[in-house]
Amino acid sequence: MAKNFLIELGTEELPPTALRSLAEAFASNFEAELKAADLAHQGVKWYATPRRLALKVAELAESQADKVVEKRGPAVSAAFDADGNPTKAAQGWARGNGITVEQAERLKTDKGEWLLHKEEVKGKPVQELVVDFAAKALAGLPIPKAMRWGNSDIQFIRPVKTLTILLGDELIEGSILGVSSARTLRGHRFMGESEFTIDSADQYPAILEERGKVMADYDARKAIILADSEKAAAAVGGKADLEDDLVEEVTSLVEWPVVLTAKFEEEFLKVPSEALVYTMKGDQKYFPVYDENKKLLPNFIFVSNIESKEPRHVIEGNEKVVRPRLADAEFFFNTDRKRPLIDRLPELEQAIFQKQLGTIKDKTDRITELAGYIAEQIGADVEKSQRAGLLAKCDLMTSMVFEFTDTQGVMGMHYATHDGEDEQVALALYEQYMPRFAGDDLPSTDISASVAMADKLDTLVGIFGIGQAPKGSDPFALRRAALGVLRIIVEKEYNLDLVDLVAKAQSLFGDKLSNANVATDVIDFMLGRFRAWYQDEGFSVDIIQAVLARRPTKPADFDKRVKAVSHFRELDAAESLAAANKRVGNILAKFDGELAQEIDLALLQEDAEKALAEKVEILAEALEPVFAAGNYQEALSRLAELREPVDAFFDNVMVMADDEALKTNRLTLLNKLRNLFLDIADISLLQK
């Protein structure tokens, strides 16, 4: 008979940003143990609050099924000697299985006859298994840094206080992480019963809500927070900023969510909203509220962990907490604006970018020149791009950014606007950091794009130039920087070459760089980011590898090639031509001599090679302007016409002829054929 199974681990406060991943991993690991043990069940559900991780398994079988295990022994031919007596090999095998050779069965196969022992294995009761399964599941959690507590050597992400393991109404005895299983559950710190006992797994999680004032279901808590926050925002005429990461964190901080609305003085709205939002979301875990025009309202929503009889006191307490932070932002904003942003440029000499690469001022000088160079290439205003580059890092020296670091860039934009800088220059100070994460918006103007690329390329070349390419960790966010440059170039269709950009960036460092191969290393690294990007976009690895094999260094051109090869792969001729290209590559790799540039038509003898040569020559001429225009999809569609003449060639022509002139001419034909494809990609790398 199947029963519901429960395990709950009570702990001290777990890290909120890791709670979901810990709970999901616990469930996944435990379910894997059940599967490996062949224990039937109707699903595993995880529960998580700041002070507990729990699993409930529906309809868990009470024991493993009995099964017959077949143990094959030596072949009959090796099990008996010429007189029919068991050999030592047979006797040893039988002894190891607790039988005699005479008791062994025979197994006949196409490859011969073997000794066989069928052993009945009784399934173990689940009570003997689950404690070990849970211990293994917990040991496999993604814990970046474990801790010890008390005098024990036991380590876990946080000290463990309680353990409950139930199968139906039966308490499973056992110990995990130094705590023995018991029926005791802990309720909310400030509401309900602080401790109580549970009689059956069937009571979970309802008993926690009823007696402990704890909502163990993570997704249910999150749903309440979302729904009630939307209602609360609507009640003040706005819409809440319910960013998922913050909602997840808040969900992980409370066991009994109560959504409340508070307000702050309207005078604070004179401060750029980004600074106010930074302190509300980052410091206090509040949800800002915006009106229909996306302007910040003087309200915020927060989630309390208690159901107070006097919610007004809770609201006032939170208003009292946030008010000084908003006042600080107001003070910094007013103070910073007393000096023009450009006046802070010399102060950048005091800030180190990287010990070997100099100060932020040094970086600013490089960004300024590189932004101007890029602007010239893409037709942007060079003077404005350089002005934006010069001002780009000045806000790092302001009080606001020093206190609220995530406001860098956006405060530069506000201060530049206040100083009367050009609108696009000011905007570039904000957009220089775009894209900040996968899927983020790109810089909206060419000036912004010039500065954004200059900043990222300077960091890439500089850090690679001193031999600090990212391995496991990536402290300078080089992967993000590389992908950012690629996205800007591809999605804005700029005709830029990484070779030129990296060379220009490298030249601006003077003699600071010690890595002689910095240009190659940076370009290879950036091309490697293409693979990750296009895989995320759904392109198969072999398509990306086919293009990477040609190492095209113009990102916009790279994009066209990938999409063209992806389209080509869907054509009927693709598989045959990919195989033919692979065959041609193998043939040419074995040839040590020199090939002519052109096919000698006079040496063509077979009809099949004449037909192929004619088709290759026609396509080579016809596709020249197509290649030049970068219309690779059209080119590959035309090259698909080679399928039949290529197949006929290999069916009817001996490439490696005895006559040296014939052989070399045929190899020249194949080389010219292959080069037509290699002008786009190495399609021989395409898989079936």
From Swiss-Prot:
The chemistry this enzyme catalyses reads: tRNA(Gly) + glycine + ATP = glycyl-tRNA(Gly) + AMP + diphosphate
According to the UniProt entry, what is the EC number of this protein?
6.1.1.14
Q: Which GO terms describe its biological process?
A: arginyl-tRNA aminoacylation; glycyl-tRNA aminoacylation
Which PROSITE patterns does its entry note?
Answer: AA_TRNA_LIGASE_II_GLYAB
GO MF annotation, one: ATP binding
> Could you tell me the keywords of this UniProt record?
Aminoacyl-tRNA synthetase, ATP-binding, Cytoplasm, Ligase, Nucleotide-binding, Protein biosynthesis
* Statement: the UniProt record of this protein carries the keyword Ligase: yes
Q: Which GO terms describe its cellular component?
A: cytosol
Q: Where in the cell is it found?
A: Cytoplasm
The yes or no answer to whether the keyword Signal is present is no
Looking up Pfam families in the UniProt record yields: DALR_1 (PF05746), tRNA_synt_2f (PF02092)
Query: Which InterPro entries has this protein been placed in?
Result: DALR_anticod-bd, Gly-tRNA-synth_bsu, Gly-tRNA-synth_heterodimer
Subunit structure, interactors included: Tetramer of two alpha and two beta subunits.
Per the record, the similarity remark reads:
Belongs to the class-II aminoacyl-tRNA synthetase family.
Under what name is this protein listed? Glycine--tRNA ligase beta subunit
Protein source organism: Aliivibrio fischeri (strain MJ11) (Vibrio fischeri)
- Taxonomy of the source species: Bacteria, Pseudomonadati, Pseudomonadota, Gammaproteobacteria, Vibrionales
